[in-house]
Curated annotation (Swiss-Prot):
UniProt keyword Transport, yes or no: yes
Gene: atpD
Entry keywords, A to Z: ATP synthesis, Hydrogen ion transport, Ion transport, Transport
Family matches, as InterPro entries: V_ATPase_D
Transmembrane feature ranges: none
Full protein name: V-type ATP synthase subunit D
Length: 210
């Protein structure tokens, strides 16, 4: 940058203003990055808690399904597969995660009333349905949280790149250029002072010889 600027007072003032703005921007970016990383960790904690809970539900669901299959005939299972067991409603909402708008898909399940189904299946089937009613919303929430983590990681990386560009490129280059312009102006001032002193000395000699 030093070779592309005019070394004068106006340039020096402009460079110093830009340097001040860059330093302030760097601090803001670092503060933002720190807060985003904390928000990411909090979100990951929520994601991990949700994942563990889903694992417990899945384990119970699989166990109940195995029990259900041992209690019912293949013909009944085939009939159940063709049935609509739930009325499903979806709702798309958004959640602000550190100024990032993250979509969340919510689901509500309403079990269909099939009176003779219990007689053909048994308690394990209905317990499995209850677990499934709880499981599906949590699965969708887990997917939404995973998407939120991805979106935040992208934003964190963008902010980190901007912060690094300022810290390791822009700010050091401005410091070097300011130093170069300041040294140039100081040298010019010293040279001018020397010339003035020489002229003054010559004038004094001329007056002394007159």
């Amino acid at each position: 940058m030093a070779s592309t600027v005019s070394p004068n007072r106006m340039t020096l003032l402009a460079l110093k203003r830009r340097y001040t703005i860059s330093k302030r921007g760097l601090k803001l970016l670092k503060d933002k990055l720190e807060a985003m990383v904390k928000a990411f960790r909090d979100l990951y904690t929520e994601f991990d808690r949700e994942r563990r809970y889903i694992e417990e539900l899945m384990e119970a669901f699989v166990e109940l399904l195995n029990q259900y299959e041992s209690e019912t005939s293949p013909a009944v299972r085939d009939r159940i597969r063709s049935m609509q067991l739930f009325q499903v409603e979806y709702e798309l909402s958004t959640r602000m995660v550190f100024n990032i708008k993250v979509p969340f898909l919510d689901v509500s399940l309403k079990r269909m009333d099939i009176p003779d189904l219990y007689l053909q299946t048994g308690p394990a089937f209905y317990k499995a349905l209850s677990v499934y009613e709880e499981l599906l919303p949590h699965l969708l929430k887990l997917a939404s949280l995973r998407n939120a983590l991805h979106m935040m990681s992208v934003e964190i990386e963008k902010t980190r790149r901007r912060s690094n560009a300022l810290e390791y490129n822009v700010v050091p280059e401005l410091e070097r250029t300011i130093k170069w312009v300041q040294q140039y102006l100081d040298e010019m001032e010293r040279s001018q002072t020397v010339r003035i002193m020489k002229v003054k000395s010559m004038l004094e000699k001329e007056r002394g010889n007159a």
